[in-house]
Swiss-Prot record:
<feature type="binding site">
    <location>
        <position position="24"/>
    </location>
    <ligand>
        <name>UDP-N-acetyl-alpha-D-glucosamine</name>
    </ligand>
</feature>
<feature type="binding site">
    <location>
        <position position="362"/>
    </location>
    <ligand>
        <name>UDP-N-acetyl-alpha-D-glucosamine</name>
    </ligand>
</feature>
<feature type="region of interest" description="Linker">
    <location>
        <begin position="232"/>
        <end position="252"/>
    </location>
</feature>
<dbReference type="GO" id="GO:0005737">
    <property type="term" value="C:cytoplasm"/>
</dbReference>
<feature type="region of interest" description="N-acetyltransferase">
    <location>
        <begin position="253"/>
        <end position="456"/>
    </location>
</feature>
<keyword id="KW-0963">Cytoplasm</keyword>
<feature type="binding site">
    <location>
        <position position="229"/>
    </location>
    <ligand>
        <name>UDP-N-acetyl-alpha-D-glucosamine</name>
    </ligand>
</feature>
<feature type="binding site">
    <location>
        <position position="229"/>
    </location>
    <ligand>
        <name>Mg(2+)</name>
    </ligand>
</feature>
<dbReference type="GO" id="GO:0000902">
    <property type="term" value="P:cell morphogenesis"/>
</dbReference>
<keyword id="KW-0511">Multifunctional enzyme</keyword>
<feature type="binding site">
    <location>
        <position position="157"/>
    </location>
    <ligand>
        <name>UDP-N-acetyl-alpha-D-glucosamine</name>
    </ligand>
</feature>
<feature type="binding site">
    <location>
        <position position="318"/>
    </location>
    <ligand>
        <name>UDP-N-acetyl-alpha-D-glucosamine</name>
    </ligand>
</feature>
<dbReference type="GO" id="GO:0003977">
    <property type="term" value="F:UDP-N-acetylglucosamine diphosphorylase activity"/>
</dbReference>
<keyword id="KW-0573">Peptidoglycan synthesis</keyword>
<dbReference type="InterPro" id="IPR038009">
    <property type="entry name" value="GlmU_C_LbH"/>
</dbReference>
<dbReference type="GO" id="GO:0008360">
    <property type="term" value="P:regulation of cell shape"/>
</dbReference>
<comment type="pathway">
    <text>Nucleotide-sugar biosynthesis; UDP-N-acetyl-alpha-D-glucosamine biosynthesis; UDP-N-acetyl-alpha-D-glucosamine from N-acetyl-alpha-D-glucosamine 1-phosphate: step 1/1.</text>
</comment>
Amino acid sequence: MERTCLAIILAAGESTRMKSAMSKVLHPVAGRPMIAHVVDALASASISDVALVVGRDADAVSAAAATDEVAVTSFLQKERLGTAHAVLAAREAIAKGYDDVLVVFGDTPLITAAPLKAARDGLAAGNDVVVIGFQATDPTGYGRLIVKDGALVAIREHRDASDEERRITYCNGGLMAIDGRKALDLLNRIGNANAKGEYYLTDLVEIARSLDGRAIAVEAPEEELTGCNTRAELAYIERLWQQRRRHELMLAGVSMIAPETVFLSWDTALAQDVLLEPNVVFGPGVRVESGAVIHAFSHLEGAHVRAGATVGPFARLRPGADLGAKSKVGNFCEVKNAEIGAGAKVNHLTYIGDAFVGAGSNIGAGTITCNYDGVNKHVTRIGANAFVGSNSSLVAPVSIGDGALVASGSVITEDVPADAVAFGRARQDVKPGRAPILRERYEAEKAARKRAKAAE
């Protein structure tokens, strides 16, 4: 029978060092709150029940952690009296009698399912407490994990460690799994006889051993246990997340010419044989199909780029942009809430918003769909194999039929039937010999302004 597990996320800190108007766990990593990354890792570890311990910005933190994947229940920690005190804020949930209780932090967005599963496996093997640790590049300041004959005998804080213990690089990552049948008894035994008068979760190791229980440590990569307390650490975590995701995508068949310049969101979906040129930014909600090319300096958000399509350089796809197979959106173009049909071309200096562009159509440089009247948005519909000449304004709501041709420089305010040619511009008026007369007048006006300025 599968073991039951309650995960407790500690997210009640004041976030003082973050120097922010909102809780640190609400700050985004790869486009979503860092606490949402933690919840996602728990879901990936097949954990279905989460107790979220909240304090500052409780409602916003609870909303950010909400998901369809796991059941999240929030518990308010009214006082800040240490990590064990925070865990006991979820006493009601712990008392339900889960097999495993897993304690994690809301500010560790790089954690993955693997060490969480390893910790639970440690409980399944008969251990009472399992601490998740890491081999520190620089262990200074971290609590050391003292392991003897495979058992974790103590967590020694740096300030209390002997010289020999300080040479240990196996450090406490803070995350912990506890035998759910014993969790409340063990937690209730933690005292606060220390300089700060706080209740520390790390005391569980020695308490369990004093009751003839057993504690062990399992190892996770150091980066997965990176916590976030400052803006500098937030930037570092973002960099680590981006590096990890880029590497995964390249191994899956995505080509990146300069991967360090590509920035992804948490849900960016890139298929095999997608090519990304340098300096591409993906906001949330982007899906790119096989064979598509995203040229340099493009920004995509909420967009679907279908197989073989090309984007950019210097293009912007906003939410609702849907590019058909082998279509093209070129340099200095913006597409928003619009469908570009298969093989259609929007090559240069164009805005397509709230529109449908049919398959095979060609939209000339400088074309604008005038979709907003100051109050409401309106739709432009362009049929298949139509041609819109350069520098045209399509004033929505308006339709251009299949195979129609719109002359350059037109302002189109009425529907254009299929296969029709539409001219929507003033007739050109040429006045022979008039240029020298106008030039002479302009020079005289310029000279008069100079004389007036000199006389001031």
